[in-house]
Amino acid sequence: MALTLEELVKRFGGEIAGDAQCKVGGLAPLDQAGPQQLAFLANPKYLSQVESTRAGAVLIAPKDLEKLGAAAQGRTAGPRNFIVTPNPYAYFARVAQMFIDLATPPRAAGVHPSATIDPAAKVAATAVIGPHVTIEAGAVIEDGVQLDANVFVGRGTTIGAGSHFYPNASVYHGCKVGPRAIVHAGAVIGSDGFGFAPDFVGDGDARTGSWVKIPQVGGVTIGPDVEIGANTTIDRGAMADTVIEECVKIDNQVQIGHNCRIGAYTVIAGSAGIAGSTTIGRHCMIGGAAGIAGHVTLGDYVIITAKSGVSKSLPKAGIYTSAFPAVDHGEWNKSAALVRNLDKLRERIKALEAALAAQGGTDA
């Protein structure tokens, strides 16, 4: 289905520079778009691609359109039509969602014959329950929820209206998932937190005893508009709930330990690990494979770059990095050798300073 720029602006705002009746039926990158497609410029370093693109129209910020100059709407090469908006990237995302919705017919409400639903569960008539879904006693499935094949919903758990669980996602007992959640395949919500009490006597080979499992009797509370990536795990709390606040976006294969609280609008990239009882503020960004120790607090607007390790609280907004960027292997070996000898070098410097001070050559 193609829409005119005028129709897009009526839905999403912005201003048209060019032909308001130009029709676009999809989106594509600047260097691949054709005359019936809409492209976008989110980074001014790609401005040269705007000049050569074959796109029918381009989403662009006002300052970037100005950079194109007076010829932007009069040249024979490149686009002549623009939707001018302060945030082309977000505009692109909304248009993309619209095109997907238009191209994807809604699934008919109902329960697949192979699904297993406890009589004590409550499932809205507008819900879509796929093959081999299991819903235990006391669970509540609200309006418009879609549970794909093999989804498991534990006893007493609530799934908020309009949520979508992809195949093989699981949410254990006693959890609350807010409206419009998106939970991707293989994600697990509410598994036991990693809680074990040491009960050992003696040392070395004479040591006896074991680890005693601590029952995890809390749950998981997830706010509205949260997205959880494939194979991500969110552990239930030991006593109080683990909490994921509204509009948090979590990538694939992320581990969130028990009793964590993740603040609203925070994003967490793939393979990050967050140990138990850690609080992350609002609007934070956690890079891929970052590791955050337990019982620490990150303030609002904290950014942790990829592969960084956080071992203490960071209350102040800012960008924090501890990862070592990749370098040539030989250079790395030289640096590693220097690091191993830092203590010896420090002692030599102290000795030299002391000798110079004794000779009156410098202040120690």
Curated annotation (Swiss-Prot):
Functional pathway: Bacterial outer membrane biogenesis; LPS lipid A biosynthesis
GO cellular component, one term: membrane
Gene Ontology MF terms: N-acyltransferase activity
Record keywords, A-Z: Acyltransferase, Lipid A biosynthesis, Lipid biosynthesis, Lipid metabolism, Repeat, Transferase
Residues annotated as the enzyme's active site: H258
Family annotation (Pfam families): Hexapep, Hexapep_2, LpxD
Catalysed reaction, written as an equation: a UDP-3-O-[(3R)-3-hydroxyacyl]-alpha-D-glucosamine + a (3R)-hydroxyacyl-[ACP] = a UDP-2-N,3-O-bis[(3R)-3-hydroxyacyl]-alpha-D-glucosamine + holo-[ACP] + H(+)
EC number assigned by the record: 2.3.1.191
One GO BP annotation of this record: lipid A biosynthetic process
The family this protein is said to belong to: Belongs to the transferase hexapeptide repeat family. LpxD subfamily.
Subunit structure: Homotrimer.
Reported function: Catalyzes the N-acylation of UDP-3-O-acylglucosamine using 3-hydroxyacyl-ACP as the acyl donor. Is involved in the biosynthesis of lipid A, a phosphorylated glycolipid that anchors the lipopolysaccharide to the outer membrane of the cell.
Name listed for the protein in its UniProt record: UDP-3-O-acylglucosamine N-acyltransferase
Organism: Burkholderia cenocepacia (strain HI2424)
